[in-house]
Amino acid sequence: SRSGDVIGIKGSEVASFAKSLQRKLLLESTPHYHQERKLWNGLADNKRPAMIAQCIDTDDVIKAVQFATAHDLLIAVRGGGHGISGNAVADGAILIDLSRMSNLSTDLKAMTATAQAGVLLRELDTGAQQHGMVVPAGVVSHTGIAGLTLGGGIGINMRKMGLTSDNLLSVEIVTADG
């Protein structure tokens, strides 16, 4: 739970939630759970979420947030999983995994890019460079754009272009009430 207490959730409720997702819900007993819970930083890679919701769109995220809220579960969110501190995963939490939300599009006329939360910096850089654009962002290619932006987005172009977050035009967020 959010308070750290161990809580029980009926198996039928977990099964119903799993069926509602377009991708998978992983539990510790599920194949690939241990592979999917891992983070980039091995020093912070000892946390065990209660479940991993592999989301592919906003509707999946809404379902995961609503399930977590209904069951008083702590929520951890992972985009690229690059964060050094390991905060993208928490013991006993529902891990909302955004890594499969990786759609990216560019608007050459507006000179903008639209990226889902699971897009990695290497993908954004490649997409921008194909159109003669540059993204004011960091230099570590496996950093997720969502986490980079949430942290401000320090990068090599910031003196000329500002932080990544300075160039953010809009976001779609899911609040605690779904």
Model-found features: residue ranges?
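N-terminal accessory segments
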Residues: 1-154, 159-160, 167
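Active-site and channel-lining beta-strand-loop segments
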Residues: 104, 163-178
